[in-house]
Amino acid sequence: MSEQEIWEKVLTLAQEKVSSASYQTFLKDTKLFKLQNEQAIVVTDDDFVANWLKMNYAEIIKAALYEAIGHEIAPVFYTEEELKSLHTSEQKEENQPEQPAKKYTPGVDEAVIGGEQFNTHNTFETFVIGPGNRFPHAASLAVAEAPAKAYNPLFIYGGVGLGKTHLMHAIGHYVLDNNPDAKVIYTSSEKFTNEFIKSIRDNKTERFREKYRNIDVLLIDDIQFIQNKEQTQEEFFHTFNELHQANKQIVISSDRPPKEIAKLEDRLRSRFEWGLIVDITPPDYETRMAILQKKIGEENLNIPTEALTYIANQIQSNIRELEGALTRVLAFSKLQGQPITTELTAEALKDIIQAPKSKKITIQDIQKIVGQYYSVRIEDFSAKKRTKSIAYPRQIAMYLSRELTDFSLPKIGEEFGGRDHTTVIHAHEKIVKDIQNDPTFKQEVENLEKEIRNQ
């Protein structure tokens, strides 16, 4: 099947999952540029559409790609201009005088991440500094300017959507911009684990070790996911030691500090504490306004200050939700064919802004509502029972816990009888698929969400 045929199938599948207006506005004119390195490079008309697809339809497109080609592949979104820029850079490299051949290192050269695989937006220049992230930004910049000489390891922790990944990508961009020959790997601990398991299964552990131990900078996201994984922790311990002893930079991110990562080996915990530990906290009002203003400035948009003020006042939890709210308002304005006003902004965000909460949603709240709906006792959510009448409501409760709370995957698993985070991921993926395939079930879940939010 050609790439054009693949994309036609993807669009046909995606069209069934979105409204006609959304399809015409955001999906109809997209193209599949190519499949490369487990990524589907999708071309869009402009930054606005690219951002909207990334924020709202990435999972739908990912599922459609899986159905079209038979294996998982992640969509990434570029504008025509960005692709031309990348192509120009590649041509410049091709026109450089031929250099002596570098020594090939098995498992490294084909796996080392180049700058084009980092998010092009996530640089130090685009990072908005405020009281909650000033120290992490300064530490990250120091590490990028002098790898392994400033803070090693650098451990960044904080809640979802606060800028940890942005800083890690920024470090990668900076290092490669100043030393194109540097070997930089950015990965998540989950991917590290999966690669390690595959290397054992395929009898290629030495190749895996060459990949991760013969580099200059290792950027590893969401390290908390290696808790409970003894073999992965053992492997990462030795990888950490080899890199550190070779004076190579290690940057780690997590949703909590090392001391709060349960079931993490003490020897790893102590190594994470060798360098500098910094935390990112939610942005204050001034920082939220600065983020919104920078965003509209980058995209050359004209939005009234009153509308931005409304967004900044209503969305306070994290940057990802803040930018998502702005994207939602822009899309709503475009679909309605109306200029952005405070009233239109409020209308666009009414479904994601709840009335002032009397209390924060807890996993216990979710278990209570789901239990009442499906006649399941709260204690059964934590039990080992696997009968469908209990197992399926448990999966729904796990899905809602991930959607409606900021708790980490391990924490959610812990609240459901100490289950592994992969069980939570599986439950979430199953319910997402069932929602997509069954309109009646989708309405059922939406009703549960409303009841939980309004309790």
UniProtKB/Swiss-Prot annotation:
One of its GO terms (cellular component) is cytoplasm. One of its GO terms (molecular function) is ATP binding. Residues 85-104 are annotated as: Disordered. PROSITE patterns: DNAA (PS01008). Keywords: ATP-binding, Cytoplasm, DNA replication, DNA-binding, Lipid-binding, Nucleotide-binding. It holds the Pfam family Bac_DnaA_C. Gene3D superfamilies: 1.10.1750.10, 1.10.8.60, 3.30.300.180, P-loop containing nucleotide triphosphate hydrolases. Its main location: cytoplasm. GO terms for biological process: DNA replication initiation; regulation of DNA replication. InterPro entries: AAA+_ATPase, Chromosome_initiator_DnaA, Chromosome_initiator_DnaA-like, Chromosome_initiator_DnaA_CS, DnaA_C, DnaA_dom, DnaA_N_dom, DnaA_N_sf. SUPFAM superfamilies: P-loop containing nucleoside triphosphate hydrolases (SSF52540), TrpR-like (SSF48295). Belongs to the DnaA family. Domain I is involved in oligomerization and binding regulators, domain II is flexibile and of varying length in different bacteria, domain III forms the AAA+ region, while domain IV binds dsDNA. This is Chromosomal replication initiator protein DnaA. It comes from Staphylococcus saprophyticus subsp. saprophyticus (strain ATCC 15305 / DSM 20229 / NCIMB 8711 / NCTC 7292 / S-41).
